[in-house]
């Protein structure tokens, strides 16, 4: 069974918490016309932490629904990893990079999904 949409975003958030990702935020971009239906933005402390978070999300989603990201951009050395599931983009960012780019503010008109 393949999972998508908000369920996929929530699954990614749950998987990221297994590796202690910080400050997870799901943004619903459907009403604001973003590049995907949902963003998940999470933070990590260092390069190994970012790599572990992204790997756990990839593993968790594959186990739950057999789905792999269409593309993985960036790497832990760039301090920003994007897992592209089509309808969900997962941004795994170093805390400093996240504070610099402030994606949540850029997409400030998007609804936040807390549960």
Regions from the language model: what does each represent?
Residues 1-35, 47-81, 95-97, 103-115:
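Polybasic/polar functional segments that serve as interface/processing modules
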Residues 37-39:
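Catalytic metal-binding acidic patch
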Residues 41-43:
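Short hydrophobic/aromatic beta-strand micro-patches
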Residues 83-85:
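Active-site beta-strand termini and strand-to-loop segments that position acidic
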């Amino acid at each position: 069974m393949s999972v998508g949409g908000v369920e996929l975003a929530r699954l990614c958030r749950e998987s990221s918490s297994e590796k202690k990702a910080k400050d997870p935020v799901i943004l619903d971009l459907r009403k604001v016309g973003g590049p995907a239906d949902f963003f998940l933005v999470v933070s990590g402390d260092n390069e190994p932490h970012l790599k572990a978070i992204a790997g756990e999300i990839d593993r968790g989603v594959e186990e739950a629904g057999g789905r792999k990201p269409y593309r993985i951009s960036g790497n832990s050395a760039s301090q920003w990893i994007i897992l592209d599931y089509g309808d969900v983009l997962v941004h795994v960012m170093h805390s400093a990079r996240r504070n610099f780019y402030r994606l949540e503010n850029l997409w400030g008109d998007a609804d936040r999904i807390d549960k």
